[in-house]
Amino acid sequence: PRLKRGFIEIRPEDVKGLEKFASTIKGALKLGRRISTVFVDLAVVGSVAVDLRGNRLGKGGGYGDIEIDLIMRENPRVIIATNIHPIQIVEKVPVSEHDKKVDLIITPDRAIWTEWGRIRHQIG
């Protein structure tokens, strides 16, 4: 929700012994440093449900879609993953034009490349 002010970088060496506090919004704001851009190779986003085509349902508000869009602007080849329980994989997720897809679904037992992810990353 604080995307208007940019991303916050939290480096492990800067929060030794304060990891739990640093994982909160208040802690991140106090211990982290603001950065204007972010370049990552793998982004893990939350989902309420996903389908095997790569469509995801977030919590509403579009914040996950905004985060994915900002990350992909810096690295178009970033892998967008979501970690979920297998019961959250559904037949079809309703989508709208602004919704962003995930490349990879991670469950406790396996990793599944979505149709979108296989096409985008040219995986057989």
Predicted regions mapped to residue ranges:
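An anion-binding catalytic pocket shared by soluble metabolic enzymes
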Residues: 1-9
